[in-house]
Each structure stands twice: as structure tokens, then as C-alpha cells.
Amino acid sequence: ALVTAGSVGQAAAWGFVAHRIVAENAAAAAPPGMVSFYKAANERISAASIEPDSVLKARDQEREKRRHYIDLDELSRPPFRDLPFDEDKARALYGDERVDAAGTLPWRIMTVLGQLRDAFRKKDWEKVVVRSGWLSHYVADAYQPLHTTKNFDGQESCNEGVHAAFETDMIDIGRTAYRASTALPASFTPEVIREPRRFIFAQIIASYDLVDEVLQADTAALAAVKKQRNDYYEEMERRVGVLARQQMSRATATTLNLWYTAWFEAGRPQLPETVPPPAVRADTP
């Protein structure tokens, strides 16, 4: 990839633009019973969606960074049938050091999902807003292929810099088109995810299957630039733009499904039609 100031390591995620698009598109598609609250809270949920990359990483450092990825190939081999989905079982099998090094993304999603469900039960609307944003962030990370592999920045395949090029630069350049093309259709109806941990792992494994396509696109785009045929980002967009849109759209659908799941499991409480003003928060991890 073209190595720029934005090129980053595994601690990074989709860029702020992509995370905001996922959160905002999910809120805009909320179903009856949730729609008024989520539309009113859209801007604040969008702001919360980037807090894991800003506020939480600044506060929690390495502990937060490892919550944004899971290098499946550090723990097992495709198709990962022997990989425990239960965190305690994974730690018993591999040890804490190895699990922490590989990343804890799927279990972080489960933790925040539980926090959101509890916030709905307690009618803590401020926490519902914040955890909705956080959950959208981690869910989106699960759909970024380079968040699932130890070769997260192409450093093992001569694709250094591909991480930021794919998830941030390419999308920032085409942000308007990405926002429109990844919105959920009006016909979309959210569903309760009955086994969220199993579902989340399935999505992450599916994301891993796309890693080679992203790396190959970077290699081809660099070759095209060297031959002065095209701009690097134009080539990346042509080769993996559809893939990026597909993953962002899937992240949006899963985000809304998990919001709906948390609300449903909390007893479908009546949500206010307005959003409380931001509170001074002392959020726990």
C-alpha cells in the first residue's frame, strides 16, 4: 500500500468516517418502538461510535487496543473448527498471554451487548445512547477483514500500509457514496439474534476469508500505480470497493440486530421520544 501518515498497526479500526456511517445508518433504520429514540439520538450515538478509538484507547491503552481485533490465525487454522467461542475455555486452552496477544474482539462485543441490555432494563437512557455507539464500533471492527489476522497491515506479504489505506483513506475519499450505498433498505426488519456469540464468531471467520482479496487488491493497485495507469485509491476502489461496501452494510445490519436483541431481551421497554442531555460520565470499561 501507499504508506502514509495514516498508516497504522492492529490497534486501529475502520476510520472515524466509516464508524459514524455504520452507526448513523443503523439508527436511521430502527424499527417501530425504537425509531423515535434512535433517530433523536442519532448524532450522539454517532459520536459515541468513535469513542472506543479515542476516549477508551487514551484511557485504557493496551487493554482497549486488544478489544478491537482477534487474530484468528494466531490461535488456530482455517476453518477454525477447534477455536473455543467461550472466552474462559479459550484462555484455559491457549493461556491468558496468547489470548490477549491475539485480541479479544468477539468477547468485547458480548460484554457491551450485555451492558446495553442492562441499560435498557434500568431505563438508563444515557447509557443506552453510549453503549449503542460503542457496540456499533466493535461490530464494525468484526467486519474489517484485517482485524482478523496477524498479517493485519500486510507486513508479512509486502503490503505494508494496506490497513489504513483500505479502511480509512479509501472510504474517506468516497464518504458520500459509501454513506448512501451502505444504508439499509426501507424493507429491512431487525431480528433477535438468539446465539449472539456463535453468530459473531461466524461473521469474524467470514471476514477472515476476505483477507487475501484485500491484500491482492493492494498488490495489484500498487503495480498499476508504478505503471502510471491509475491512482492507487481509484484502483483499490475498483477492486475492493464492493467488498468494503458489503462489509459496512453487513456491519450496519448486525449493529441494528444487536440493538434490537438487547431491547427485546430487556422486555422491550418504552423508549422516550427525546434524548436526555449528555451527562458527566464515569463509564466503566
Whereabouts are the PLM-identified features?
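Short alpha-helix carrying the canonical HExxH Zn2+-binding catalytic motif
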Residues: 128-136, 140-142
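Bacterial N-terminal signal peptides
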Residues: 1-7
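N-terminal, motif-rich segments that launch catalysis or mediate targeting to/interaction with membranes
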Residues: 7-130, 145-285
